[in-house]
Amino acid sequence: MTNEETFLASLDKAMEKLIYGTVPFPPVSEDDEDDEEDDDWNPSGHHETPHSKEYPKFLMRQNVKKYTIRISLQGIRPVIWRKLEVPSNISLAFLGFVLLEAMGWENEHLHQFRKGNHFYSPASQQDPDMFPDFGGVVNHKSEEFCLSDIMTEKGDKVLFDYDFGDDWHHQILLSSVGDYADDEPRKVRLIGGKNACPPEDCGGEWGYRTLCKYYYTGKRAKGVDESFYSWVDEDFDPEYFPLEEMKAWMDGMND
């Protein structure tokens, strides 16, 4: 079975689940990961990094470790994933922007980290009237916490949500914990990834699956307005991810 046939088969199964009932997607092994416009264009299609004075990039912590993390978008097959090396003391505020850039999101919507009943988001995004505390939920300012405050051991997992309308959910896995050499710079590094990020505001999981099916087959879903398919233009390619260009772009975030 070719890659395209595999992709289409997974889309068909996903659509059946949406129509006949939701079934959780199976866990993805890390073995699956190793297959290898704005006017101011850059590989991720993004904007400049917010001024670092808006939040601390790194927090004061002792014994800073080298974390390898893998972020994957939930509910989409084939998996859209990125792998990064980050210092364990990276602030959640800075990490949130790093993850949006690495995935390919344009930072046009709210985002948050979740671990259990603890939610972490930028202070500028917190509005008690819009997001009141619900039964046991504890809200934190992401500027005040670093990654090692919520992940410490290999295998730890945290959720990362983006765009509460389209409702994108990501899983962050702590793949490894290592030590820095004395002369090794402690910085953010993109080291792997595969498949393109969905377009902003395309309608969440269902919308993106519908776009992909049209891209591969030319078939339109019943009841979907013609204008919806304008997302699928000559630049749309679900399998596109320029790893080397993105590595260079992400390295610029360390400046």
Question: Each predicted region: which residue ranges?
Answer:
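Short linear regulatory motifs enriched in tryptophan with gly/pro/ser
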Residues: 1-255
